[in-house]
A protein has these predicted regions:
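Short helix-to-turn junction characteristic of helix-turn-helix DNA-binding domains
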Residues: 47-51
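Short acidic, hydrophobic short linear motifs in intrinsically disordered regions
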Residues: 53-66
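A short, conserved structural fragment
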Residues: 84-94
Length: 127
């Protein structure tokens, strides 16, 4: 049976998103590195989703999973390269196929992402 989400609950989550974007996320350089664009957010969520689900993901897979309406393939790959330069992700060579390089978030990015999610889900304060 599906859980019914009330308008009040949606309002609460929306307020947490606003507070989170204006406080935690606005001052967290790790999260800011992904830009607050649609494709930047999708890149971040793809990386973190693959990490938490223990499913390796490549830059190409990320680029192919994001609709061209959000950003060009080149823009997506460049943002991933920037995240690597900023030491927010590392690339690990696949053991089964040396041509494949999987993207893995660093501890700093994992910490920032968990802080952001924890705040949005009302698990922690802004401080």
């Amino acid at each position: 049976m599906a859980k019914i989400i009330t308008q009040k609950r949606i309002a609460g989550y929306t307020l947490r998103l606003l507070e989170g974007y204006n406080s935690i996320m606005a001052y967290d350089d790790n999260i800011l590195s992904f830009k607050f664009s649609a494709y930047g957010t999708l890149i971040l969520f793809n990386i973190m989703n693959s990490y938490y689900n223990n499913k390796p993901i490549t830059s190409e897979e990320i680029a192919n999973s994001i609709d061209y309406k959000f950003g060009s393939r080149n823009s997506i790959l460049n943002l991933i390269k920037t995240a690597e330069k900023n030491k927010l992700i590392i690339r690990a060579v696949s053991k089964s196929d040396q041509r494949q390089k999987y993207i893995i978030p660093t501890k700093a990015l994992i910490h920032s992402h968990e802080k952001m999610i924890g705040f949005i889900l009302n698990l922690e304060d802004k401080s």
